[in-house]
Swiss-Prot record:
Cellular component GO terms held in the UniProt record: plasma membrane; proton-transporting ATP synthase complex
Organism: Pseudarthrobacter chlorophenolicus (strain ATCC 700700 / DSM 12829 / CIP 107037 / JCM 12360 / KCTC 9906 / NCIMB 13794 / A6)
Coiled coil: none
Role description: Key component of the proton channel; it plays a direct role in the translocation of protons across the membrane.
Gene Ontology molecular function terms on file: proton-transporting ATP synthase activity, rotational mechanism
Membrane topology classification: Multi-pass membrane protein
Keyword Ion transport tagged: yes
Record-given protein name: ATP synthase subunit a
Record's keyword terms, sorted: ATP synthesis, Cell membrane, CF(0), Hydrogen ion transport, Ion transport, Membrane, Transmembrane, Transmembrane helix, Transport
Length: 266
């Protein structure tokens, strides 16, 4: 854990880790790679890992798939059938499978970094990456809506059908703020805040264990065992949340695309 690697406090008092501990040191000394952090390196490595895995899985396809081919096909089928087909449906879903597939596994791998010893840093615990992904999705579904419905899409997205005319002055501003302001912000912050909060809890638990073990009191040393048990439970819960957040982000993307494609029926 990063938390267990934090230096002990000289004051003898417990000082919980903060946001600063979420920033890993630069890759090269003396500012030689300023602006290129370890988080960026992890992002690039995630692309390599994903590409290598699926290239190897699809390289020698057989009628009776081996373990690697089966894993690749199952992963692809999960996104294709479980998200794209179920949410978007019709004949439109297939063209959006590459986007949803890339989003899911890109987020998944970068989240799983937080569960790997000695790395333990989910990339999206930094808000910048979450903003970029949410921004890509935001402009994508708007472009899809305009392509399908023309500029009339903005009317379809902000003026609900069947609403009495005298309520529209209240409803339209709410729809504009909800669809074009709140939606992209919550899409990014949901991923970022969950990863940040979960990782901070694990870091605090790790620092607490270190602090208790270093105390002279036998009672406090024994308490560290309980904290360790809680930390392991939180670690497992965080690992589950890492997978769920990749799924939720991709699922919401599919919902937004479906809404843009069928704006005239909402």
């Amino acid at each position: 854990m990063i938390a267990l690697a934090l230096p002990a406090q000289d004051s003898g008092e417990f000082t919980p880790p903060g946001i600063n501990e979420m920033h890993l040191p630069a890759i090269l000394p003396w500012g030689a790679a300023e602006g290129f952090s370890k988080q960026m390196l992890l992002v690039l490595l995630s692309v390599v890992f994903i590409a290598v895995f699926f290239v190897l899985a699809a390289r020698k396809q057989q009628l009776v798939p081996g373990k690697l081919q089966f894993a690749g096909e199952a992963a692809y089928g999960f996104v294709r059938n479980g998200i794209a087909k179920d949410i978007i449906g019709g004949r439109d879903f297939i063209k959006y499978v590459p986007l949803l597939f890339s989003l899911f596994f890109f987020i998944l791998v970068n989240n799983i970094y937080g569960a790997i010893p000695l790395i333990q840093l989910p990339t999206f615990s930094h808000v910048g990456g979450a903003y970029v992904l949410a921004g890509i999705v935001y402009f994508t579904w708007i472009a899809i809506g305009i392509k399908k419905n023309g500029l009339r899409y903005f009317k379809l997205a902000t003026v609900p059908s069947g609403v009495p005319w005298f309520i529209l002055p209240i409803v339209i501003p709410i729809e504009i703020i909800s669809n074009f302001v709140v939606r992209p912000v919550t899409h990014s912050l949901r991923l970022f805040a969950t990863m940040l909060a979960g990782h901070l809890i694990v870091m605090i638990a790790g620092s607490g264990i270190e602090y208790l073990v270093m105390q002279e009191s036998i009672l406090l040393k024994g308490t560290s065992v309980l904290v360790l048990a809680g930390a392991i439970a939180m670690y497992m819960l965080e690992a589950l949340i890492m997978v769920l957040q990749a799924y939720v982000f991709t699922l919401l993307t599919a919902i937004y695309i479906e809404g843009a494609l069928h704006a005239d029926s909402h």
